[in-house]
A protein has these predicted regions:
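Short helix-capping segments at alpha-helix termini
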Residues: 30-34, 83-87, 138-139
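Short glycine-/acidic-enriched loop or helix-start segments at secondary-structure transitions
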Residues: 19-20, 47-49, 73-74, 129-132
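Nucleotide phosphate-binding/pyrophosphate-handling subdomain across enzymes
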Residues: 1-60
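C-terminal helical cap/extension that packs against the catalytic core
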Residues: 7-9, 51-116
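Glycine/aspartate-rich loop-and-adjacent alpha/beta segment that forms the canonical ThDP
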Residues: 123-140
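Periplasmic-binding protein-like
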Residues: 117-121
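Cofactor-binding loop segments of dinucleotide-utilizing enzymes, especially the Rossmann-like FAD-
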Residues: 39-44, 65-66, 122
């Protein structure tokens, strides 16, 4: 967890097994009313399998990509995610920092009693870059 209000959790789940463990933990250990996922996956990973495991617990997903040359393009990931989540629950933001800002904006609802969690997942590089960006963002 790198931030509270909104709660932001980083988890480098980069395969379906890891995504299932993340989904189980979120379902059993947290009490979120809504979950926003920021997901960036490497091109050689099972993106469909990862997203299938996350779908039951994620309300909407922001697909993105890290700076790695191995990263799947956000547009390709959007196509996969839209088949699993439906187009109305998927947003594509190719730049990771902008995707994170979008998630924080989506999760910030001053007049709401809802507890909204943000998870960042899909690859070690995505999570590492997100961690660096979020530390700078919230250090201000």
């Amino acid at each position: 967890m790198v931030h509270r209000d909104p709660t932001i959790i980083l988890d480098a789940a980069h395969n379906p097994h890891g995504a299932k463990a993340l989904a189980d933990t979120l379902a059993n250990e947290f009490n979120f009313d809504e979950i926003v996922a920021v997901v960036g996956v490497f091109g050689d990973k099972d993106a469909q399998g990862i997203l299938l495991e996350l779908e039951p617990i994620v309300d909407h997903v922001i697909v993105t990509q890290s700076s790695s040359t191995r990263a799947m393009s956000s547009s390709e990931l959007e196509k996969i995610a839209s088949k699993i989540f439906g187009v109305d629950r998927v947003f594509e933001v190719s730049d990771l920092a902008t995707a994170l800002d979008r998630a924080v904006s989506d999760a910030t609802r001053p007049l709401s009693e809802d507890t909204i969690g943000i998870i960042v997942t899909g690859s070690v590089v995505t999570v590492g870059e997100a961690r660096s960006y979020l530390r700078k963002k919230f250090a201000k």
